[in-house]
Amino acid sequence: MNYADIRPIDVANGPGIRVSVFVSGCTHACPECFNPEAWDFEYGAPFTQAEADQVLQALEKPYIKGLSLLGGEPCHPRNQEAVLDLVRQVRERFPEKDIWCYTGYLFEDLAAGKVGEHSRALLEQLDVLVDGPFVIGLKNLGLRFRGSSNQRIIEVRPSLERGEPVLWDETSVE
């Protein structure tokens, strides 16, 4: 897997101060995507253990709330294995930090294992999933942590337990 960017400080892609990893490679090709250069799977540089260590080091700071995964498409089958390895390392070392993931895929398809062999395992490591493609006709700049009204902010663990999406509480002060 390649990555487009690692931001050791990010306040736009989830609650609190976060570390964000932008992976390369996406096939959704959403019109007016904010990161179209990351559609190319070869864009950026290889994501190796050195980059994972950089992310882990950034997460050591006590004021960092968690990790956000964006793209590109973190849940694309070509990216799943590397993303899963990273989130497992984060979970092991920082169980108190939350992990958010932005994807153009739907929760239901990821949970059913319809999006690559690691989609369910990856989902099980996440706290929050922002799902659905960006749709320009549904763009709404007033939404928290997403760009269009079709996208959902989903609490992953209760959703997996119930077998249906449980939405994140947007009134949260985080």
Where are these regions (language model features)?
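Conserved Radical SAM active-site core
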Residues: 1-4, 17, 35-101, 105-119
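N-terminal pre-triad scaffold of radical SAM enzymes
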Residues: 2-29
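Conserved C-terminal portion of the radical SAM core fold
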Residues: 60-69, 91-98, 130-136, 160-174
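Glycine-rich nucleotide phosphate-binding loop and flanking beta-alpha elements
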Residues: 75, 136-137
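P-loop/Walker A phosphate-binding loop and immediately adjacent motor/lid segment at beta-alpha junctions
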Residues: 82-91, 139-174
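Receiver (REC) domain switch/active-site residues of two-component response regulators
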Residues: 127
